[in-house]
């Protein structure tokens, strides 16, 4: 079986030169996938200044380098209210398909233009759902923030804010076209299946879990600390919920009078949220740790009271799954696909988005009741070990591919 992936990252291409957490879960999948007999894998991704094709350790890589768009073209994209012309990109994708001649094509994510190639090839195309831009855009701003407020932070950045918003809107329109064009989907949650069927009611949907980063599979022991420690891994977009962390931490400190440490990993720009909440992260025992390697995050999770996930929207965040497989109790907002990962009060806790009061109560409860904490964490680990079993995931993926290929042949 010849398989072509279009991905948002280079996966293991030049893996030794990467500095930022490797290639993530797709690189983990690649390592397992290429060990299967009778599988030939090619991976294509955007990366300028590279050859058209590179073969390395049994994988064929196709870095894509687009010709630079003229300024007038960029201006048209910025001002346009319709899906832009992606003929140049589609032509590049078709060259790769023609060169590799795959039996099946998997597009990882609907965030970029890869999926637009589906109507132009007879090869079956399946979309691996990651996030879905349209509902993400709907939840982009916390309830106390407007686009006007966001633009007024720095008048000098007004044009940049407009461009960012316009890019999101255009990407959502492009995604809508992709979801209409692709017939086959692989997802993991009730949420991503429901949303996909809104855009494409007749699509064929297959379940497929994701492989986590390697350090989280290694045998590890969770040790509850005597002091209260909370860990979170998020990124900078406002919908990731840093405001909920600030508000929850304030209740823990000023109302419940608890001593604690809250370590937040990832690229965080706190100034805007601090200004709008009136809470500075230093004043409520929060430590911004920046980007860290998987092993460091793993050790922090193994030695914390709980893992807190504050997003206003998410599908199946790997940060939550990584905490679960380590046996850590997760408190998360009840949004998007997260209820497919966590059963409330069984293998974790779910709270409404923007509810710092329940969040603070549950953190306090887990700190005081170590038996409850350990039981919930153990339940989470049992579920996550099954969900993220490497062999099962790869076997399921190949089975999905074969079903899609067979279905495609029947429909010709």
PLM regions and their residue ranges:
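N-terminal subdomain of nucleotide-sugar transferases
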Residues: 1-55, 59, 250
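Conserved donor-binding/catalytic core segment of Leloir-type glycosyltransferases
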Residues: 4, 221-240, 246-249
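Membrane-proximal helix-turn-helix segments that form the acceptor-binding/catalytic region
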Residues: 28-29, 133, 149-185, 198
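Nucleotide-activated donor-binding/catalytic signature segment of Leloir-type glycosyltransferases, i.e.
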Residues: 273-295
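Short hydrophobic beta-strand element within catalytic cores of glycosyltransferases
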Residues: 329-332
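Conserved acidic donor-binding segment of nucleotide-sugar-dependent glycosyltransferases
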Residues: 344-345, 349-356, 365-370
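A short, well-ordered alpha-helix in the C-terminal region of glycosyltransferases
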Residues: 358, 365, 372-387, 393-399, ...
